[in-house]
Design a protein with these regions (language model features):
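A generic structural motif
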Residues: 186-193
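Short proline/glycine- and acidic-rich turn/helix-capping motifs at secondary-structure junctions
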Residues: 178-186, 216-219
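Short, basic/aromatic recognition patches
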Residues: 18-25, 97-101
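Short loop/turn motifs at secondary-structure junctions and domain boundaries
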Residues: 25-31, 102-106
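Residue-level detector of anion-binding/catalytic polar loops
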Residues: 33, 109, 170, 210-211
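Cytosolic beta-strand hydrophobic patch enriched in CBS
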Residues: 14-15, 33-50, 90-91, 109-123
Length: 219
């Protein structure tokens, strides 16, 4: 899946002149945590987050509620935002796994999606990536979810798929990943529609050297 397939299109954008208090209200009203800041032609100039707008704890002790309100009213997003050169971005043709790796590496919760000239065309957040992961594994449709552990060698996954073909079963979602703490094996998670747990158990248990480590009805 590519970023263009999972990003939020036409995200809410804000100008440099927006007051911090207005940015807080805009984010609360739209239930968002990240707000790209743009200049002329929707070109990215920065990024503001709820964390950036939060008043620091050491300041709370010296200001009363009216002073805090006045402080936020005087502040503009351009004074608080992550500056354009420091904003980590991604393009629509990159993969979702690359976006996940970038967000993990930089410990950030979103990536503005830009095209040539830093033109903002979308935004991808942690929620977007989690939604994509759910779709890859067949949510929200019902089916039997089975995890099969197999040796990490050529041909094992083909043998698993051959059984599914032989049974004429469809696949709603699939994912593979190395087994934790055991580099000699890996797990395949498959969601199969219109079957029973007993049918899947019987068919897949016949594959030599492959082990069903989890099986359940799932939605």
């Amino acid at each position: 899946m590519l970023i263009r397939d999972c990003m939020t299109r036409h995200p809410i954008l804000a100008p440099l002149s927006l007051r911090a208090s207005e940015a807080q209200a805009l984010m609360a009203e739209n239930n968002i945590r990240h707000l790209p800041i743009v200049g002329d032609g929707k070109r990215l100039t920065g990024l503001i987050t709820r964390e950036r707008l939060a008043v620091k704890a050491d300041m709370l002790g010296s200001l009363n509620v009216w002073e805090i309100s006045r402080f936020l009213s005087d502040q503009r997003v351009r004074d608080l935002m992550v500056k354009g050169k420091d904003v980590i971005t991604i393009t629509p043709d990159r993969t979702v796994e690359r976006a996940a790796a970038m967000m993990t590496e930089h410990k950030i919760g979103c990536l503005p999606v830009v095209e040539e000239g830093d033109l903002v065309v979308g935004i991808v957040t942690e929620n977007d990536l989690l939604r994509s992961y759910q779709e890859m594994l067949g949510l929200p449709s019902a089916g039997v979810r089975v995890t099969v552990r197999m040796p990490n060698r050529h041909g094992e996954f083909v043998r698993l798929m051959a059984v599914l073909v032989e049974q004429n079963w469809g696949v709603m979602g699939i994912g593979t990943f190395p087994t934790r703490r055991d580099p000699t094996t890996y797990d395949a998670v498959i969601k199969i529609p219109n079957v029973t747990i007993e049918e899947v158990q019987a068919a897949l248990s016949s594959i030599p050297n492959q082990l069903i480590v989890d099986i359940r009805a799932a939605v």
